[in-house]
Amino acid sequence: MSTINGCLTSISPSRTQLKNTSTLRPTFIANSRVNPSSSVPPSLIRNQPVFAAPAPIITPTLKEDMAYEEAIAALKKLLSEKGELENEAASKVAQITSELADGGTPSASYPVQRIKEGFIKFKKEKYEKNPALYGELSKGQAPKFMVFACSDSRVCPSHVLDFQPGEAFMVRNIANMVPVFDKDKYAGVGAAIEYAVLHLKVENIVVIGHSACGGIKGLMSFPDAGPTTTDFIEDWVKICLPAKHKVLAEHGNATFAEQCTHCEKEAVNVSLGNLLTYPFVRDGLVKKTLALQGGYYDFVNGSFELWGLEYGLSPSQSV
């Protein structure tokens, strides 16, 4: 297995019916680079923000040094203009009152309140406005995509790629890794792949890596052998040891940060290769009912790369 510019160019698994000409090549690149000195946040595909943080429920424009009376007057004015915010304002006031009573520290009820408010917002803005969609989803799911993504809180695929409910069957773990077929050691991952391919009949499996990945940094830092200092993490990230070895061989003189970036992409290629060890995945590829794709989300610069497994050679495409 070899790569060019972080993309797998050939795969020759021992147990496969695939032709030796199978290649992984870049098929799509979407960039939205920004000036580092700019105060404007980088944007992604479909002009979505990089960080999809919940919008504040109440957003009055108040001066930092506003007196108590002015703040109360401003709140009353806002509610007189937007009466629909009364319930939400009452909830916020109750939360602030509780925090002040506890000496200004966040209330122990904050997590519950945050989840409650999040669901209310979702139900009002998404669920109740899309009855047809959620009516169909109540009958079952038929996603076209299976996505392997990192557990990192900054890289939720639903936000980054604008996936809608029912559109993608997702597995998230440390460093978005796919282990080789193993009924005993990695049954959880195997069960997800089996269900997605054989029962949901997904048409695409996408493995998405990302910038500044802590799991990949760990892989590049941990010794390859010997005693471990963690219960699970070191053994897990070693799934992609071949990526680490390849990066060190080809980029031995690069800085550690540069090596990590190379490994973030190369680990995706290793996971794509590991998918070929699953019999039902190979069968889907041979029958052309399934496609494998690798992706890389750079949230530092606001860019996304996508490359795919195809038979034979054809011109690369970029946008």
Swiss-Prot record:
PROSITE patterns: PROK_CO2_ANHYDRASE_1, PROK_CO2_ANHYDRASE_2. GO terms for biological process: carbon utilization. The keyword Lyase applies. Residues 1-98 form a transit peptide. Its main location: plastid. It is found in: Plastid, Chloroplast stroma. Pfam families: Pro_CA. One of its GO terms (molecular function) is zinc ion binding. GO terms for cellular component: chloroplast stroma. The keyword Phosphoprotein does not apply. Its EC number is 4.2.1.1. Coiled coil: none annotated. Belongs to the beta-class carbonic anhydrase family. Homohexamer. Reversible hydration of carbon dioxide. This is Carbonic anhydrase, chloroplastic.
